[in-house]
């Protein structure tokens, strides 16, 4: 049986890990390289590293931080933020990223997902979908959650799978930073539509939320930031808790 993954997320702004509520009121939660090492040593299955200002300000991801992080991290590292083309993906993989997360560019240039999955393999192409509920549907947002595309998130998820994405990182913008749990309706709708793994993101406040993301949202992996950054729970505590609930994890 496949093990469910626990993934701490490092949102980075100006070279520092930050965690805000709904992408706006950011608080400083430490140095990304040191945080990554703590998580790597602490049993994280993967680490997600997102430069949350890169797309908005149209600047390159901080390659040196990625490189230093990868040297201290001995678990798979997913890196995103400011990825605009195949060359950016190539640079990130060369800096030590195992997977590259693509958000804004996947909407603006869907063919880039086809090209990059052919060139590098679908296993290292993650499409990040930031979605917000509007009536009875969810819409895709880009540029760090600032621009509404009016694109249906469920349809977009299927299109990205068809284009060659190996995984989807699905963030509920309504839940991000709120600590009230994932939007499991959104997660379940996407996971029921595609045959590739989805990572649930946005809203974790306690360990039961991780359980719900897997059981109710049908996610293959659960991502969280605040509960790990501020020491509410360790990765090991999260794994032991999921294990106690009968959810297969790597202990």
From Swiss-Prot:
GO (cellular component) term, any one: cytoplasm
EC annotation from Swiss-Prot or TrEMBL: 4.3.2.10
UniProt GO molecular function: imidazoleglycerol-phosphate synthase activity; lyase activity
Active site location: 11, 130
Record flagged with keyword Amino-acid biosynthesis: yes
Localisation: Cytoplasm
UniProt GO BP: L-histidine biosynthetic process
SUPFAM superfamilies found in the cross-reference section: Ribulose-phoshate binding barrel
InterPro entries for the chain: Aldolase_TIM, His_biosynth, HisF, IGPS_HisA/HisF, RibuloseP-bd_barrel
Keywords: Amino-acid biosynthesis, Cytoplasm, Histidine biosynthesis, Lyase
Catalysed reaction, written as an equation: 5-[(5-phospho-1-deoxy-D-ribulos-1-ylimino)methylamino]-1-(5-phospho-beta-D-ribosyl)imidazole-4-carboxamide + L-glutamine = D-erythro-1-(imidazol-4-yl)glycerol 3-phosphate + 5-amino-1-(5-phospho-beta-D-ribosyl)imidazole-4-carboxamide + L-glutamate + H(+)
Top-level taxon of origin: Bacteria
Pathway(s) this gene product operates in, as recorded in its UniProt entry: Amino-acid biosynthesis; L-histidine biosynthesis; L-histidine from 5-phospho-alpha-D-ribose 1-diphosphate: step 5/9
CDD domains with a match to the protein in the record: HisF (cd04731)
Keyword Lyase attached: yes
UniProt subunit comment: Heterodimer of HisH and HisF.
Function: IGPS catalyzes the conversion of PRFAR and glutamine to IGP, AICAR and glutamate. The HisF subunit catalyzes the cyclization activity that produces IGP and AICAR from PRFAR using the ammonia provided by the HisH subunit.
PANTHER family, alphabetized: IMIDAZOLE GLYCEROL PHOSPHATE SYNTHASE HISHF, IMIDAZOLE GLYCEROL PHOSPHATE SYNTHASE SUBUNIT HISF/H IGP SYNTHASE SUBUNIT HISF/H
Name of the protein: Imidazole glycerol phosphate synthase subunit HisF
